[in-house]
């Protein structure tokens, strides 16, 4: 059940809150939370505004990496010849390793493996692991630039995902906790604006560096840019999320904490039976939290719509420049897609957060914005790919992207506010896992398979874009049946799943 955020805020003079559940944290997570809260008070800390800026820059660099590897300058193409015998040289990663479109799509999705595995771990354990994760990211990106075989670059991309997971599950809950009440959606919009902006910047960056130097230099440059933030991850004070004080006072786990000369030591019983018991409690606690999330109907429907949405956006971000180059013979596809995406991404994402704040940020209003913006965006994007005129395509596609990107703040607002504060990091982690494992992880290889089969980028993009209508339909169901989600009729969730399954089945035969 959704609780009002005001009801979840603990009184100033109290140490506990009636909305925080200690059962939602596992013993191992509690232990690390205690460690985080016991850091010496003199350790350096940053204001929420500065942390928002840092998170935005890190997010920007993460998605710039995705845009760079998708750019024609870095991704490249295989050697091809036309009917007249005129051949084009092999370029970029695809040309260097002679990859098919399917293998190229696998390269796009491989980093998600690390992200999916590591996100719940980072969400449950140490708040200080941001520094470790960003260090892994930096080393992995260096490895991408130094790759000597296809399997090696795929492995490095997996570790890039591990690095990204270090902050992605913690950043949004922290921003929501610390943003002014009337600007929560706007702050989230600013953070998620970095997703399309980063991808667009990656298109331009990768296209320029790949063309003038080598695709390898694009990765090495990213590592240099991220290195200072990896160091900062070790130096800044650990994040403290809502519910931390409750854990501090009520869940010591019989740990004796001592602070001597600015050093923190934890003494715990090390017997095998105690360790096994702690691990067992960790897994049972995690299972209980997952059961709570699964029963939260708003969360389930929101994520189902987000999965469909991300399936399209993930494939757009990777195949967009190549599709545009082949359909409209764009000479500067990286620059054009980059410019359109960065402008529409910034304006659309910020507008979505601003509009949600203006109409009052609530879950019903968020669902209205999600379904309406996604449907109209799908109409414009679908129509754009039917046009033969390059300028007509750019105009309509820009309008479509503007509307589609307006969903970033609302969809994450729902993820954060449909559960109690203590479950927000896990909610964001599971949402991230779901939208990737069912969304953009399979979409890039599947689009590659479709393109290899029908050999028409226009038809491929039209098939892909049509899935946005499914996302709009799911979010619309969430809006019109919101009251039913909070009723005791458990069969309603089954009805929703059957509707989505039938819709997907019918779509497969349309």
Curated annotation (Swiss-Prot):
One of its GO terms (biological process) is lipid transport. Signal peptide: none annotated. The chain crosses the membrane at residues 44-64, 106-126, 136-156, 158-178, 185-205, 219-239, 298-318, 336-356, 369-387, 392-414, 430-450, 462-482. GO terms for cellular component: mitochondrial inner membrane. It comes from Arabidopsis thaliana. It is found in: Mitochondrion inner membrane. Keywords: Glycoprotein, Lipid transport, Membrane, Mitochondrion, Mitochondrion inner membrane, Transmembrane, Transmembrane helix, Transport. Belongs to the major facilitator superfamily. Spinster (TC 2.A.1.49) family. Probable sphingolipid transporter. This is Probable sphingolipid transporter spinster homolog 3. Glycans are attached at residues 75, 98. The lineage of its organism: Eukaryota, Viridiplantae, Streptophyta, Embryophyta, Tracheophyta. It comes from the Eukaryota. InterPro entries: MFS, MFS_dom, MFS_spinster-like, MFS_trans_sf. One of its GO terms (molecular function) is transmembrane transporter activity. It is a multi-pass membrane protein.
